[in-house]
């Protein structure tokens, strides 16, 4: 069963803090135009996206796209997808700042058996599915850009390319 969870964002929090106080001669008018009280803002991209429940829902939706895509689905044909989803969630929790450590394999080691068959075409397909998933879940473009920068930072390791 597919869960529907709306990913939340930090944007309303930021807007409330950035509203300018307009100059006024009246204290009442100044109070009326003062910024809304700042509320506690999430401190990580993981929190901005909605935390555990929202990221788990995104991982589920993401892997539904992966297994339906012939470009990349063959890499998961002998994979226990429940375990894979759990690993992906744990990695994203770490990579997006929701967990302080990663206990899994490094990206180069985790993907080494797929190389040389794994290419940039596959990496881009996976990245596109994640971006599409975040878009469908209502994540603002700024947050998608941040999340995709995290994904892009793993490219060299995932594809087992020489380090620069």
UniProtKB/Swiss-Prot annotation:
Entry-linked Gene3D superfamilies: Globins
Cofactor: heme
Induction conditions: By light.
Chain segment of the transit peptide: 1-22
The protein's name in its UniProt record: Group 1 truncated hemoglobin LI637
Entry-linked PROSITE patterns: GLOBIN_FAM_2
Keywords in alphabetical order: Chloroplast, Heme, Iron, Metal-binding, Oxygen transport, Plastid, Transit peptide, Transport
Intrachain S-S bonds: none
One Gene Ontology cellular component: chloroplast
Family according to the record: Belongs to the truncated hemoglobin family. Group I subfamily.
Binding positions for heme per the UniProt entry: 63, 111
Gene responsible for this protein: LI637
Main location: plastid
Pfam family, one: Bac_globin
Lineage of the species this protein comes from: Eukaryota, Viridiplantae, Chlorophyta, core chlorophytes, Chlorophyceae
Gene Ontology terms, MF aspect: heme binding; metal ion binding; oxygen binding; oxygen carrier activity
InterPro entries: Globin-like_sf, Globin/Proto, Globin_bac-like_CS, Hemoglobin_trunc
Complex and partners: Monomer.
Subcellular location: Plastid, Chloroplast
Comment on bound cofactor: Binds 1 heme group per subunit.
